[in-house]
């Protein structure tokens, strides 16, 4: 058995090398060569290497990486005629999150500001000759309701005035008709998911309340969100003012808070029959 050991070790090494090779993805654009490696058994972390004219100019090895299939390498994502590379990065562990890394592939590599993804992976979409980045805002994950029922609002970003901003033309909607708003409020108010003590203290909220309020806020209708709160709040429940205060404070933590405030100032396209943008898939 001992005399066959070198042969066995060589065979195992060849198998291991074949697995490692199969785990590497590679794409090229002009003088750039981009390599993404993952261990064949899927163990974190992975490795990202960007080479310019054969020389490594960027290396990352603290996350799991993948090419953004929705944006081909060299795409002009910002409309500035700069070819770009988009790489999805995932940090494992308790603080896991997706992030979209962006690189300018000009004469010299440029590391651009990354785009957030949160607990789900963002993607690019090309419409009307423009590139948009679509993701979810997880600011309200676990707020007042369990994590599985909490809202995660869909956001659409476009590169405008030197940074990625909420695309008003894709986000802004008109206010809901009053009759529909009243119907939604009545359904929330009468939901059996409320748990209210005789003292008026709330033990459990109806998840549709923060979800629909955020639907309205993220489509540029914050005033109607507060109208919904007034109409949907159970008469026996205490703490409506505190709920609204906490809601505003949580909203201010969003990375898109400034753009959300501006969204309300954009003229709406007309009355809407739906504001569903924060309901999770």
What are these regions (language model features)?
Residues 49-62, 101-115, 158-168:
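Surface-exposed loop/turn elements that mediate protein-protein interactions on large endomembrane-trafficking
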Residues 1-4:
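Positively charged n-region of N-terminal signal peptides that target proteins for export
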Residues 21-42, 132-281:
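Acidic, small-residue rich beta-repeat scaffolds with periodic aromatic anchors
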Residues 64-65, 116-121, 169-178:
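Short, solvent-exposed aromatic-acidic interface loops
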Residues 29-36, 76-91, 126-140:
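Acidic/hydrophobic-patterned starts of short beta strands in beta-sheet-rich repeat architectures
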Residues 7-17:
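Bacterial N-terminal signal peptides
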Residues 36-65, 80:
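N-terminal, Lys/Arg-enriched amphipathic/low-complexity engagement segments
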Residues 67-75, 117-125:
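Repeated scaffold domains used in trafficking and secretory/extracellular systems
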């Amino acid at each position: 058995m001992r005399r066959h050991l070198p042969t066995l070790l060589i065979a195992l090494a060849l198998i291991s090398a074949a697995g490692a090779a199969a785990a590497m993805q590679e794409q090229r654009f002009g003088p750039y060569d981009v390599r993404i490696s993952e261990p064949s058994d899927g163990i974190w972390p992975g490795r990202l290497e960007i080479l310019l004219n054969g020389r490594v100019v960027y290396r990352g090895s603290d996350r799991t990486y993948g090419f953004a299939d929705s944006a081909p390498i060299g795409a002009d994502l910002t409309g500035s005629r700069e070819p770009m590379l988009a790489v999805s990065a995932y940090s494992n562990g308790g603080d896991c999150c997706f992030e979209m890394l962006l690189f300018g592939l000009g004469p010299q590599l440029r590391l651009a500001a990354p785009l957030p993804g949160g607990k789900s992976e963002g993607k690019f979409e090309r419409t009307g000759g423009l590139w948009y980045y679509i993701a979810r805002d997880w600011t309200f994950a676990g707020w007042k309701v369990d994590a599985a029922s909490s809202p995660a609002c869909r956001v659409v970003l476009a590169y405008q005035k030197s940074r990625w901003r909420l695309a008003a033309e894709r986000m802004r909607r008109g206010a809901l008709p009053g009759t529909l708003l009243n119907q939604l409020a009545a359904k929330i108010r009468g939901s059996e998911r409320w748990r209210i003590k005789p003292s008026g203290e709330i033990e459990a909220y109806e998840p549709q309340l923060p979800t629909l309020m955020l639907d309205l806020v993220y489509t540029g209708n914050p005033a109607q969100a507060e109208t919904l709160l007034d109409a949907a709040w159970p008469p026996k429940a205490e703490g409506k003012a505190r709920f609204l205060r906490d809601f505003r404070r949580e909203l201010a933590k969003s990375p898109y808070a400034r753009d959300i405030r501006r969204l309300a100032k954009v003229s709406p396209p007309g009355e809407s029959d739906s504001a569903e943008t924060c309901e999770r898939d």
